[in-house]
From Swiss-Prot:
CDD domains: PP2Cc (cd00143). Its EC number is 3.1.3.16. The lineage of its organism: Eukaryota, Metazoa, Chordata, Craniata, Vertebrata. It is found in: Nucleus; Cytoplasm. This is Protein phosphatase 1E. It is an enzyme of class 3 (hydrolase). Keywords: Cytoplasm, Hydrolase, Magnesium, Manganese, Metal-binding, Nucleus, Phosphoprotein, Protein phosphatase, Repeat. It comes from Rattus norvegicus (Rat). GO terms for cellular component: cytoplasm; nucleolus; nucleoplasm; nucleus; protein-containing complex. PROSITE patterns: PPM_1 (PS01032), PPM_2 (PS51746).
Amino acid sequence: MAGCIPEEKTYRRFLELFLGEFRGPCGGGEPEPEPESEPEPEPEAELVAAEAAEASGEDPGEDAATVEAAEEGVQDQDPEPEEEAVEEEAAAEGEEEEEEEEAAAPGHSAVPPPQPQLPPLPPLPRPLSERITREEVEGESLDLCLQQLYKYNCPSFLAAALARATSDEVLQSDLSAHCIPKETDGTEGTVEIETVKLARSVFSKLHEICCNWVKDFPLRRRPQIYYETSIHAIKNMRRKMEDKHVCIPDFNMLFNLEDQEEQAYFAVFDGHGGVDAAIYASVHLHVNLVRQEMFPHDPAEALCRAFRVTDERFVQKAARESLRCGTTGVVTFIRGNMLHVAWVGDSQVMLVRKGQAVELMKPHKPDREDEKQRIEALGGCVVWFGAWRVNGSLSVSRAIGDAEHKPYICGDADSASTVLDGTEDYLILACDGFYDTVNPDEAVKVVSDHLKENNGDSSMVAHKLVASARDAGSSDNITVIVVFLRDMNKAVNVSEESDWTENSFQGGQEDGGDDKENHGECKRPWPQHQCSAPADLGYEGRVDSFTDRTSLSPGPQINVLEDPDYLDLTQIETSKPHSTQFLPPVEMIGPGAPKKAYVNELIMEESSVTPSQPERSGAGELLVSFNLGSTGQQICRMENLSPVYSGLENEQFKSPGKRASRLYHLRHHYSKRQRGFRFNPKFYSFFSAQESSRKIGISLSSLTRSGKRNKMLRSSLPWRENSWEGYSGNMAIRKRNNISCPDLPWDYKI
């Protein structure tokens, strides 16, 4: 076809393949039976005789006379010869049939062999609701078409065009045959439409349109801009998946809008108490958006009204069908160079411009002061029950649905608009399962690292973000949509203003424990409730985790082992630093430990060794202070010392006996929480060493390792039994003789 778009061949090819798999609602899963072939009529006797005469070279006239004479002779004969002739004829026919069967060879048979039955076709999408109103027919028709087409990887432009054409055909047809009249108290109630019958009509129209377009593909203008998107959603630890998302890059084509700039629509809905509200919003909100009068000139206000209309209609549906669920939602609508955002609840969207996170919205949560005042003014309350909740129930202050919580949980959306000047990188739309554990700067870091590692390939960015939220401890459903606003194949550069550095998550801290480098600083304001992940949730097998430094601890099991390389504290010269020998990386296990940790330098100076209290019981004590400066594994061993005791603050010391005198298990505290396993150590100082009676010196070297359930400490010292009084005396002086280690997540006393 002259003047056709370059993709027309691709579209035609898809339609051909699609029709091979999709035969409409009446096709079911079985092929249509083929019509049986009618038997050929037997040739008349005269024609057979004429053909035989031609073959023998005789005159047809003579043959005809012969035939007539034969017939007269037959009539004059007795009946007995007639019966014999019939028997002979039957025998001849039997011989002919046998000859035909013998002549019929494989491949030459007149009757084709039975064809094998084709495999059943995939089932058609089933409507998620049994009944709908007339106002919901358009959204339901579009959704059924798009589901079926996207199942076969239909191009979005073609899918939008087919869905629009099918929906128009359905809306123009007579829907009265699908209606279910409903009467209440003798008065006419709401007229509803049976969705199963509607679905049959939709798929029948879709099949018909596809057949027509294969023969004569209509000219369609192609969109000017396509936004590359990366989408991923997981159920995670929840029993059901209650998130829904919508991605409509061809908004104008889907609604046949010819007088508007290029438009795109993206949304995430996070349901609670059931999935019905999220499904309803994902199917009907964009349809309600287009129907608003102010949509052509004020999309932001149209979005707010669309939320309100969707909420009202779902509340009515919930009353008819006894539904008790709701959903939060965030919608981004792009028209030309304008970005419009509307939301209810705690689902969020963030914009990244020049490598920096830009705040676009503030989620609706009960702890917001304005939301709290609104709820209390209506007679409700906001209480703490694991989280701030409205009337002790829901942890969001606005949502679609939740009819039993109205008016405290309202469906009024907030909106915001911003101009896109071309410096924007991408948008991240996600539910609270993502933003509760990953803050904006961390998300930017994840995307930037992924693009650098994959040469700008953005197809798996959403998977990476979902994995980061899951590893950070999120147990909720997680849905992430990343909409790229520019070509990400170009070099990805983080702006100079950013606090992120390549080695932000390696090495120890040099700022006295302040972890600014690990988290970065957002240059623009952001809601404080989402600024960091829980500190007690660790990443399995990741050194560059985004949680607080405390989650990078070696894990719940620590072993102090022997090592021949140690520092002699008495041999340190003035102002000459010494360090231990570097060890190879040691494999570690535990929910809060990286897979590998490295031994960092252990630097000590002469000034760090000072005499302490006077000798007690013949043993001198040294107070040794130094900075290990590492969160990895350290080595510390004590040799030639007097007996040293280990224990925990506020814990009673228990000796394991002679045979286990070298192995002391330390008791720890554990607690269960909803998002996983949490370990709370209850001790705060590191080492307390006593001077040896043989005056050889004090040598320190300790190695910590992580296990899964317990922590243990072992030393090569000649431990010996001691009385309770001796133990009490040593425990009394323990607090005054210690080596402080502010950078380690746990400190031990020996």
